[in-house]
Design a protein with these regions (language model features):
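Short beta-strand segments within Ig-like beta-sandwich modules, predominantly Fibronectin type-III
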Residues: 56-60
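Intrinsic low-complexity tandem-repeat regions in disordered proteins
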Residues: 125, 151-153
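Structural signature of tandem-repeat unit edges
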Residues: 26, 61-66, 74, 86-122, ...
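Boundary/junction segments of secreted and surface-exposed precursor proteins
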Residues: 18-40
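Conserved Ser/Thr-centered positions that define the repeating blades of beta-propeller domains
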Residues: 47-50
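Structural motif
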Residues: 37-42, 77-80, 113
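Sec-dependent, cleavable N-terminal signal peptides
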Residues: 1-21
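Noncatalytic modules at the cell exterior or secretory-pathway interfaces
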Residues: 33-35, 65-82
Length: 153
């Protein structure tokens, strides 16, 4: 009984952490929408969850993730304390098909939860959504301390 109670408490704590975080979130606005990441001489840590933050999978460059049904969501996070992209020759961009609305904070790609308000490096989110014609809504850009060309495209 004690093991069951402990497991329940651990699951409850994990759910609280997932709901408290402000993850970058992609929501399908039509069936079969997809997203992926293209890395140009760059390899940031990016993970996604399709089950509300219970399990996380690394988002590898060139891999497309399908949001099968309208309303399906993907949470995104990363551990990139020195910045997501580096400069005009070393950066990563999302790629999308279908129709996808973004919400939450891009800062979850930096600190894993979307709490930091400081852009850690120049060019941090350079070209992040360049060419994403499928993006119907932009995410929150909450940083209050910016750096050179941090949101440039």
């Amino acid at each position: 009984m004690k093991k069951i109670f402990t497991a329940f408490i651990m699951m409850l704590c994990a759910a609280c952490v997932a709901s408290a975080a402000n993850y970058l979130t992609f929501t399908a606005e039509e069936d079969g929408s997809t997203f992926g990441i293209v890395n140009k001489n760059n390899n940031p840590d990016v993970q996604y969850s399709l089950d509300g933050g219970e399990t996380w999978t690394a988002l590898a460059g060139g891999k497309m993730v399908t949001l099968a049904h309208k309303g399906d969501k993907a949470l995104l996070r990363g551990d990139n304390p020195e910045g997501f992209s580096k400069d005009t020759k070393k950066y990563s961009s999302f790629t999308m098909t279908g129709m996808i609305a973004a919400s939450g904070s891009v800062m979850s790609l930096i600190d894993g939860v979307g709490e930091t308000l400081v852009i850690p490096a120049n060019y941090c989110f350079y070209n992040l959504f360049v060419g994403c014609k499928s993006l119907t809504k932009a995410p929150t850009l909450p940083a209050t301390t910016l750096s050179k060309r941090c949101y440039a495209f």
